[in-house]
Amino acid sequence: MKLIAQVKLVVTPEQSVALTETLESANALCNGLSEWAWDNKVFGKYAIQTARYHQVRAESGLTAQVVIRCIAKVANSYKTAFTLHKEHVKRTERTNKNRAVKGLPPKELPVMEACKFRAHGSIAYDDRILNWYVAKQQVSVWTTQGRLKLPFVCGDFQKRLLASQQGESDLVYRNGKWFLLAVCEVENPPLKEVDGFLGVDLGIVQLATDSEGHSYTGAKCMALRRRVKKHCASLQKKGTKKAVRRLQKQSRRQSRYSTWLNHNISKNIVRSAVQSRKAIAMENLEGIRERVSALRRELRWQIGNWSFAQLQGFVSYKARLQGVPVAFVSAPYTSQTCSACGHCERANRKSQSDFHCIQCGFQTNADYNAARNIACRGLEARASLN
Protein backbone atom coordinates (compact mmCIF):
# COMPACT_ATOMS: atom_id res chain seq x y z
CA MET A 1 0.00 0.00 0.00
CA LYS A 2 1.22 3.49 -0.84
CA LEU A 3 1.15 6.20 1.83
CA ILE A 4 2.38 9.79 1.82
CA ALA A 5 4.91 11.05 4.37
CA GLN A 6 4.93 14.85 4.70
CA VAL A 7 8.02 16.57 6.09
CA LYS A 8 8.67 20.27 6.64
CA LEU A 9 11.87 21.73 5.20
CA VAL A 10 13.92 24.12 7.32
CA VAL A 11 15.28 26.69 4.87
CA THR A 12 17.08 30.02 4.97
CA PRO A 13 15.73 33.03 3.00
CA GLU A 14 18.39 32.44 0.32
CA GLN A 15 17.44 28.78 -0.02
CA SER A 16 13.76 29.74 -0.19
CA VAL A 17 14.54 32.03 -3.13
CA ALA A 18 16.31 29.18 -4.93
CA LEU A 19 13.38 26.83 -4.38
CA THR A 20 10.91 29.50 -5.52
CA GLU A 21 12.87 30.09 -8.73
CA THR A 22 12.88 26.35 -9.37
CA LEU A 23 9.10 26.09 -9.00
CA GLU A 24 8.51 29.12 -11.22
CA SER A 25 10.84 27.84 -13.96
CA ALA A 26 9.37 24.34 -13.92
CA ASN A 27 5.76 25.54 -13.98
CA ALA A 28 6.50 28.05 -16.73
CA LEU A 29 7.82 25.12 -18.77
CA CYS A 30 4.68 23.11 -17.93
CA ASN A 31 2.46 25.95 -19.19
CA GLY A 32 4.42 26.15 -22.44
CA LEU A 33 4.21 22.39 -22.95
CA SER A 34 0.49 22.43 -22.10
CA GLU A 35 -0.28 25.10 -24.70
CA TRP A 36 1.66 23.17 -27.35
CA ALA A 37 -0.07 19.91 -26.42
CA TRP A 38 -3.50 21.56 -26.59
CA ASP A 39 -2.84 23.27 -29.92
CA ASN A 40 -1.44 20.10 -31.50
CA LYS A 41 -3.82 17.65 -29.78
CA VAL A 42 -0.91 15.59 -28.48
CA PHE A 43 -1.44 14.46 -24.90
CA GLY A 44 0.56 11.27 -24.32
CA LYS A 45 3.79 11.49 -22.31
CA TYR A 46 5.88 9.62 -24.87
CA ALA A 47 4.46 11.64 -27.78
CA ILE A 48 5.12 15.00 -26.05
CA GLN A 49 8.61 13.90 -25.02
CA THR A 50 9.50 12.73 -28.54
CA ALA A 51 8.33 15.97 -30.12
CA ARG A 52 9.46 18.57 -27.57
CA TYR A 53 12.20 17.25 -25.27
CA HIS A 54 15.35 18.40 -27.08
CA GLN A 55 14.03 21.89 -27.85
CA VAL A 56 12.70 22.67 -24.38
CA ARG A 57 15.78 21.11 -22.78
CA ALA A 58 17.97 23.57 -24.67
CA GLU A 59 15.71 26.59 -24.15
CA SER A 60 14.71 26.15 -20.51
CA GLY A 61 18.11 25.64 -18.93
CA LEU A 62 16.62 22.99 -16.64
CA THR A 63 18.29 19.66 -16.06
CA ALA A 64 17.18 16.70 -18.16
CA GLN A 65 15.28 14.91 -15.41
CA VAL A 66 13.34 18.03 -14.41
CA VAL A 67 12.23 18.43 -18.03
CA ILE A 68 11.11 14.79 -18.07
CA ARG A 69 9.12 15.32 -14.84
CA CYS A 70 7.48 18.45 -16.31
CA ILE A 71 6.43 16.52 -19.42
CA ALA A 72 4.98 13.79 -17.19
CA LYS A 73 3.12 16.41 -15.13
CA VAL A 74 1.49 17.86 -18.25
CA ALA A 75 0.53 14.43 -19.62
CA ASN A 76 -0.94 13.31 -16.28
CA SER A 77 -2.85 16.59 -15.91
CA TYR A 78 -4.54 16.12 -19.29
CA LYS A 79 -5.33 12.50 -18.50
CA THR A 80 -7.06 13.59 -15.29
CA ALA A 81 -8.73 16.57 -16.98
CA PHE A 82 -10.25 14.40 -19.73
CA THR A 83 -11.61 11.94 -17.16
CA LEU A 84 -13.15 14.72 -15.02
CA HIS A 85 -14.57 16.47 -18.09
CA LYS A 86 -16.22 13.27 -19.27
CA GLU A 87 -17.81 12.75 -15.83
CA HIS A 88 -18.92 16.41 -15.73
CA VAL A 89 -20.61 16.06 -19.13
CA LYS A 90 -22.45 12.92 -17.97
CA ARG A 91 -23.64 14.65 -14.80
CA THR A 92 -24.86 17.65 -16.79
CA GLU A 93 -26.72 15.41 -19.24
CA ARG A 94 -28.45 13.61 -16.37
CA THR A 95 -29.35 16.97 -14.83
CA ASN A 96 -30.78 18.19 -18.14
CA LYS A 97 -33.01 15.11 -18.37
CA ASN A 98 -34.46 15.93 -14.95
CA ARG A 99 -34.85 19.60 -15.90
CA ALA A 100 -36.67 18.62 -19.11
CA VAL A 101 -39.20 16.59 -17.09
CA LYS A 102 -39.84 19.67 -14.93
CA GLY A 103 -40.09 21.94 -17.98
CA LEU A 104 -36.88 23.84 -17.17
CA PRO A 105 -34.33 24.97 -19.79
CA PRO A 106 -31.20 22.78 -20.06
CA LYS A 107 -27.84 23.78 -18.64
CA GLU A 108 -24.95 24.33 -21.04
CA LEU A 109 -22.56 21.41 -21.39
CA PRO A 110 -19.11 22.11 -19.91
CA VAL A 111 -16.34 23.09 -22.31
CA MET A 112 -12.82 21.84 -21.68
CA GLU A 113 -9.86 24.21 -21.87
CA ALA A 114 -6.08 23.82 -21.89
CA CYS A 115 -4.53 22.88 -18.55
CA LYS A 116 -2.83 25.73 -16.71
CA PHE A 117 -0.33 25.55 -13.87
CA ARG A 118 0.20 27.96 -10.98
CA ALA A 119 3.62 29.59 -10.74
CA HIS A 120 4.16 28.07 -7.30
CA GLY A 121 2.43 24.75 -7.95
CA SER A 122 4.14 21.60 -6.73
CA ILE A 123 6.68 19.73 -8.85
CA ALA A 124 7.72 16.09 -8.64
CA TYR A 125 11.26 14.94 -7.87
CA ASP A 126 12.57 11.42 -8.36
CA ASP A 127 15.73 9.71 -7.09
CA ARG A 128 17.90 11.33 -9.78
CA ILE A 129 17.27 14.88 -8.55
CA LEU A 130 16.49 14.33 -4.86
CA ASN A 131 18.23 12.20 -2.24
CA TRP A 132 16.95 11.33 1.22
CA TYR A 133 19.23 11.05 4.27
CA VAL A 134 16.65 9.98 6.82
CA ALA A 135 19.13 9.25 9.64
CA LYS A 136 20.49 12.80 9.37
CA GLN A 137 17.01 14.26 8.71
CA GLN A 138 18.33 15.89 5.59
CA VAL A 139 17.55 15.96 1.86
CA SER A 140 19.62 16.94 -1.15
CA VAL A 141 17.42 18.81 -3.65
CA TRP A 142 18.23 20.02 -7.17
CA THR A 143 17.45 23.70 -7.81
CA THR A 144 18.21 26.19 -10.54
CA GLN A 145 21.04 27.44 -8.31
CA GLY A 146 22.53 23.98 -7.84
CA ARG A 147 22.10 21.25 -5.26
CA LEU A 148 20.94 22.25 -1.78
CA LYS A 149 21.22 20.17 1.36
CA LEU A 150 18.20 21.00 3.50
CA PRO A 151 17.29 19.75 6.99
CA PHE A 152 13.73 18.63 7.61
CA VAL A 153 11.49 18.02 10.61
CA CYS A 154 8.71 15.46 10.98
CA GLY A 155 6.97 13.21 13.48
CA ASP A 156 7.91 9.68 14.47
CA PHE A 157 5.22 8.16 12.24
CA GLN A 158 6.61 9.98 9.20
CA LYS A 159 10.14 8.82 10.07
CA ARG A 160 9.00 5.22 10.09
CA LEU A 161 7.27 5.72 6.75
CA LEU A 162 10.37 7.25 5.17
CA ALA A 163 12.26 4.02 5.79
CA SER A 164 10.15 2.57 2.95
CA GLN A 165 10.28 5.65 0.69
CA GLN A 166 10.10 4.76 -3.01
CA GLY A 167 9.51 6.71 -6.19
CA GLU A 168 8.63 10.37 -6.42
CA SER A 169 8.49 13.17 -3.87
CA ASP A 170 6.56 16.41 -4.43
CA LEU A 171 8.06 19.78 -3.49
CA VAL A 172 5.19 21.90 -2.15
CA TYR A 173 5.09 25.60 -1.21
CA ARG A 174 2.19 26.32 1.14
CA ASN A 175 1.49 29.43 3.21
CA GLY A 176 5.11 30.57 3.12
CA LYS A 177 6.47 27.16 4.16
CA TRP A 178 8.19 24.37 2.24
CA PHE A 179 7.23 20.71 2.38
CA LEU A 180 8.21 17.45 0.73
CA LEU A 181 5.53 14.81 0.21
CA ALA A 182 7.22 11.44 -0.22
CA VAL A 183 5.55 8.33 -1.63
CA CYS A 184 6.21 5.36 0.68
CA GLU A 185 5.48 1.73 -0.12
CA VAL A 186 4.20 0.03 3.04
CA GLU A 187 3.81 -3.73 3.21
CA ASN A 188 0.21 -4.80 3.71
CA PRO A 189 -0.24 -6.99 6.79
CA PRO A 190 -2.35 -10.14 6.25
CA LEU A 191 -6.07 -9.66 6.83
CA LYS A 192 -7.17 -10.87 10.26
CA GLU A 193 -9.78 -13.49 10.98
CA VAL A 194 -12.85 -11.59 12.14
CA ASP A 195 -15.98 -12.39 14.10
CA GLY A 196 -18.71 -10.32 12.45
CA PHE A 197 -18.87 -6.72 11.22
CA LEU A 198 -18.76 -3.32 12.85
CA GLY A 199 -21.34 -1.26 10.96
CA VAL A 200 -20.58 2.46 10.56
CA ASP A 201 -23.34 4.91 9.63
CA LEU A 202 -22.09 8.29 8.38
CA GLY A 203 -24.16 11.43 8.74
CA ILE A 204 -24.17 15.20 9.05
CA VAL A 205 -25.46 15.76 12.59
CA GLN A 206 -23.62 12.68 13.87
CA LEU A 207 -20.57 12.29 11.64
CA ALA A 208 -20.29 8.59 12.45
CA THR A 209 -22.17 6.08 14.57
CA ASP A 210 -21.10 2.45 14.88
CA SER A 211 -23.10 -0.66 15.68
CA GLU A 212 -21.56 -0.87 19.16
CA GLY A 213 -23.16 2.44 20.12
CA HIS A 214 -20.20 4.79 19.75
CA SER A 215 -21.21 8.13 18.23
CA TYR A 216 -19.11 11.05 16.98
CA THR A 217 -20.88 14.39 16.79
CA GLY A 218 -20.47 16.88 13.97
CA ALA A 219 -22.01 19.81 15.88
CA LYS A 220 -18.76 21.75 16.32
CA CYS A 221 -17.72 21.13 12.72
CA MET A 222 -21.11 22.31 11.41
CA ALA A 223 -21.03 25.37 13.67
CA LEU A 224 -17.61 26.27 12.27
CA ARG A 225 -18.89 25.83 8.70
CA ARG A 226 -21.87 28.10 9.38
CA ARG A 227 -19.64 30.74 10.96
CA VAL A 228 -17.21 30.59 8.04
CA LYS A 229 -20.10 30.72 5.55
CA LYS A 230 -21.53 33.84 7.19
CA HIS A 231 -18.12 35.48 7.42
CA CYS A 232 -17.30 34.60 3.80
CA ALA A 233 -20.56 36.15 2.60
CA SER A 234 -19.64 39.49 4.19
CA LEU A 235 -16.07 39.31 2.85
CA GLN A 236 -17.23 38.51 -0.69
CA LYS A 237 -19.27 41.71 -0.75
CA LYS A 238 -16.11 43.73 -0.18
CA GLY A 239 -14.14 42.08 -2.99
CA THR A 240 -10.79 43.58 -1.90
CA LYS A 241 -7.48 41.71 -2.02
CA LYS A 242 -7.38 41.67 1.77
CA ALA A 243 -10.86 40.16 1.84
CA VAL A 244 -9.80 37.46 -0.64
CA ARG A 245 -6.83 36.57 1.57
CA ARG A 246 -9.12 36.36 4.59
CA LEU A 247 -11.47 34.11 2.62
CA GLN A 248 -8.63 31.76 1.74
CA LYS A 249 -7.42 31.73 5.34
CA GLN A 250 -10.90 30.87 6.63
CA SER A 251 -11.28 28.10 4.05
CA ARG A 252 -7.94 26.55 4.99
CA ARG A 253 -8.81 26.70 8.68
CA GLN A 254 -12.10 24.91 8.11
CA SER A 255 -10.39 22.28 5.96
CA ARG A 256 -7.68 21.65 8.57
CA TYR A 257 -10.22 21.19 11.34
CA SER A 258 -12.35 18.83 9.26
CA THR A 259 -9.28 16.75 8.35
CA TRP A 260 -8.13 16.62 11.98
CA LEU A 261 -11.60 15.54 13.11
CA ASN A 262 -11.88 12.83 10.46
CA HIS A 263 -8.45 11.47 11.40
CA ASN A 264 -9.49 11.15 15.04
CA ILE A 265 -12.86 9.59 14.26
CA SER A 266 -11.30 7.06 11.88
CA LYS A 267 -8.66 6.10 14.46
CA ASN A 268 -11.37 5.41 17.03
CA ILE A 269 -13.46 3.38 14.58
CA VAL A 270 -10.50 1.20 13.59
CA ARG A 271 -9.49 0.80 17.24
CA SER A 272 -13.00 -0.41 18.08
CA ALA A 273 -12.89 -2.90 15.20
CA VAL A 274 -9.50 -4.27 16.32
CA GLN A 275 -10.61 -4.63 19.95
CA SER A 276 -13.85 -6.38 19.01
CA ARG A 277 -12.17 -8.56 16.31
CA LYS A 278 -14.59 -7.35 13.64
CA ALA A 279 -14.39 -6.20 10.05
CA ILE A 280 -15.76 -2.76 9.15
CA ALA A 281 -18.83 -2.21 6.96
CA MET A 282 -19.70 1.22 5.52
CA GLU A 283 -22.26 2.50 3.05
CA ASN A 284 -21.38 3.02 -0.59
CA LEU A 285 -22.27 6.72 -0.92
CA GLU A 286 -20.93 7.25 -4.44
CA GLY A 287 -23.02 9.76 -6.38
CA ILE A 288 -25.02 10.95 -3.36
CA ARG A 289 -24.50 14.64 -4.20
CA GLU A 290 -26.08 14.13 -7.62
CA ARG A 291 -29.26 12.81 -6.00
CA VAL A 292 -30.04 15.80 -3.79
CA SER A 293 -31.21 18.35 -6.38
CA ALA A 294 -34.81 18.07 -5.14
CA LEU A 295 -33.89 18.81 -1.52
CA ARG A 296 -34.15 22.24 0.07
CA ARG A 297 -31.18 24.58 -0.26
CA GLU A 298 -29.98 24.27 3.35
CA LEU A 299 -29.78 20.47 3.15
CA ARG A 300 -28.05 20.63 -0.25
CA TRP A 301 -25.45 22.94 1.30
CA GLN A 302 -24.94 20.58 4.24
CA ILE A 303 -24.46 17.56 1.97
CA GLY A 304 -22.17 19.56 -0.32
CA ASN A 305 -19.91 20.31 2.64
CA TRP A 306 -20.07 16.76 4.03
CA SER A 307 -16.58 15.21 3.91
CA PHE A 308 -17.77 11.59 4.00
CA ALA A 309 -15.35 10.46 1.27
CA GLN A 310 -12.36 11.70 3.26
CA LEU A 311 -13.57 9.94 6.41
CA GLN A 312 -14.18 6.69 4.53
CA GLY A 313 -10.73 6.94 2.95
CA PHE A 314 -9.10 7.46 6.35
CA VAL A 315 -10.97 4.49 7.82
CA SER A 316 -10.02 2.30 4.84
CA TYR A 317 -6.29 2.92 4.93
CA LYS A 318 -5.99 2.83 8.72
CA ALA A 319 -7.93 -0.44 8.78
CA ARG A 320 -5.69 -1.90 6.07
CA LEU A 321 -2.61 -1.04 8.13
CA GLN A 322 -4.11 -3.03 11.02
CA GLY A 323 -5.17 -5.96 8.82
CA VAL A 324 -8.88 -5.21 9.32
CA PRO A 325 -11.11 -5.99 6.29
CA VAL A 326 -13.40 -3.20 5.04
CA ALA A 327 -16.60 -3.75 3.05
CA PHE A 328 -18.84 -1.20 1.31
CA VAL A 329 -22.51 -2.16 1.23
CA SER A 330 -25.67 -0.86 -0.41
CA ALA A 331 -26.90 2.33 1.27
CA PRO A 332 -30.66 2.61 0.47
CA TYR A 333 -33.19 2.21 3.30
CA THR A 334 -30.70 1.54 6.10
CA SER A 335 -32.31 4.39 8.05
CA GLN A 336 -35.89 3.17 7.45
CA THR A 337 -35.40 -0.55 8.10
CA CYS A 338 -35.90 -1.99 11.57
CA SER A 339 -32.73 -3.76 12.69
CA ALA A 340 -34.81 -5.95 15.04
CA CYS A 341 -37.54 -7.32 12.75
CA GLY A 342 -36.50 -6.15 9.27
CA HIS A 343 -39.66 -4.15 8.55
CA CYS A 344 -38.93 -1.26 6.17
CA GLU A 345 -41.17 1.79 6.08
CA ARG A 346 -40.58 5.52 5.94
CA ALA A 347 -42.82 6.04 8.97
CA ASN A 348 -40.32 4.11 11.11
CA ARG A 349 -38.00 7.13 11.07
CA LYS A 350 -39.81 9.56 13.35
CA SER A 351 -37.16 12.28 13.25
CA GLN A 352 -33.47 12.79 12.60
CA SER A 353 -32.54 11.00 15.82
CA ASP A 354 -35.55 8.81 16.68
CA PHE A 355 -36.41 5.40 15.24
CA HIS A 356 -39.62 3.60 16.23
CA CYS A 357 -40.68 0.52 14.28
CA ILE A 358 -44.43 0.64 13.68
CA GLN A 359 -44.58 -3.14 13.33
CA CYS A 360 -42.64 -4.56 16.30
CA GLY A 361 -42.34 -1.42 18.45
CA PHE A 362 -38.52 -1.46 18.58
CA GLN A 363 -37.19 1.97 19.63
CA THR A 364 -33.64 3.30 19.49
CA ASN A 365 -31.43 6.04 18.08
CA ALA A 366 -31.92 6.26 14.30
CA ASP A 367 -28.19 6.36 13.48
CA TYR A 368 -27.48 3.40 15.76
CA ASN A 369 -30.28 1.46 14.07
CA ALA A 370 -28.79 2.26 10.64
CA ALA A 371 -25.33 1.14 11.81
CA ARG A 372 -26.79 -2.21 12.90
CA ASN A 373 -28.40 -2.62 9.47
CA ILE A 374 -25.08 -1.83 7.78
CA ALA A 375 -23.35 -4.48 9.92
CA CYS A 376 -25.99 -7.03 8.84
CA ARG A 377 -25.48 -6.13 5.19
CA GLY A 378 -21.76 -6.65 5.67
CA LEU A 379 -22.45 -10.17 6.93
CA GLU A 380 -24.78 -10.82 3.98
CA ALA A 381 -22.15 -9.59 1.51
CA ARG A 382 -19.50 -11.87 3.04
CA ALA A 383 -21.89 -14.84 2.99
CA SER A 384 -22.67 -14.30 -0.71
CA LEU A 385 -18.96 -14.13 -1.53
CA ASN A 386 -18.27 -17.33 0.41
For each predicted feature, which ranges?
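Nucleic-acid substrate recognition interfaces
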Residues: M1-N386
